[in-house]
């Protein structure tokens, strides 16, 4: 004869079914609590916060860490759209603008670090092609690649849509890595210019 539990037995705290049901409910409740926390960790750092450190490589393979750059002086961190399937003309224009003002940045002991994000496949080659559209980068300006959006995700800047990579963004960091200024653009052409940065610093 098959043993059948009554409703009362199934709901008894010592019942195996009751214990299994309780464990399942606990697991679901735990997931609901943990998932929002994981999502919150990717929030974009704001003015006054400390910028998360990262290490990326130049297209030629030289490692560059944000902490090393900020230790040298005020650092302008610019996240480009990188390679969304083509070379972004707004990015070309923005980098050209900063290169033209490199002496103004150098006079204030500023470093500029561009981040070029995109899918890992041939990203270094795409970045080299991008730099061919520029004059040679001066000593106080560097460009690093962000394959598979490591830094982009760390800063909560991933523009997760077809033919998109990252929201164009600019941060100004002091020598301790604290954010003095930040701008996150939600369109391709809304960029921070070199003059914008220089005028912001003059106000401080």
Which residue ranges define each predicted feature?
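N-terminal secretory signal peptides that target proteins for export/translocation
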Residues: 1-22
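Bacterial N-terminal signal peptides
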Residues: 26-37
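Short active-site neighborhood of thiol/selenol oxidoreductases, capturing the structured segment around
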Residues: 69-96
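Thiol-/selenol-based redox modules, centered on thioredoxin-like
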Residues: 165-204
């Amino acid at each position: 004869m098959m043993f059948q539990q009554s409703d009362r037995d199934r709901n008894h705290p010592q019942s195996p079914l009751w214990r299994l049901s309780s464990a399942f409910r606990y697991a679901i409740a735990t997931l609901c609590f943990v998932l929002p926390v994981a999502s919150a960790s990717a929030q974009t750092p704001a003015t006054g916060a400390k910028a998360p450190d990262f290490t990326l490589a130049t297209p030629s393979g030289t490692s560059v860490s944000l902490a090393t750059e900020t230790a040298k002086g005020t650092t302008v961190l610019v996240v480009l759209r990188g390679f969304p399937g083509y070379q972004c003309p707004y990015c070309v224009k923005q980098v050209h603008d900063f290169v033209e003002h490199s002496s103004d940045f150098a006079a204030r002991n500023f470093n500029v670090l561009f981040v070029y994000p995109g899918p890992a496949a041939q990203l270094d080659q795409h970045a080299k092609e991008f730099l061919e559209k520029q004059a040679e980068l001066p000593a106080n300006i560097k460009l690093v690649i962000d394959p598979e959006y490591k830094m982009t995700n760390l800063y909560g800047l991933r523009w997760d849509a077809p033919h998109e990579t990252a929201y164009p963004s600019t941060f100004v960091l002091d020598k301790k890595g604290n954010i003095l200024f930040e701008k996150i653009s939600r369109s391709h052409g809304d960029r921070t210019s070199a003059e914008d940065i220089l005028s912001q610093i003059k106000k401080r």
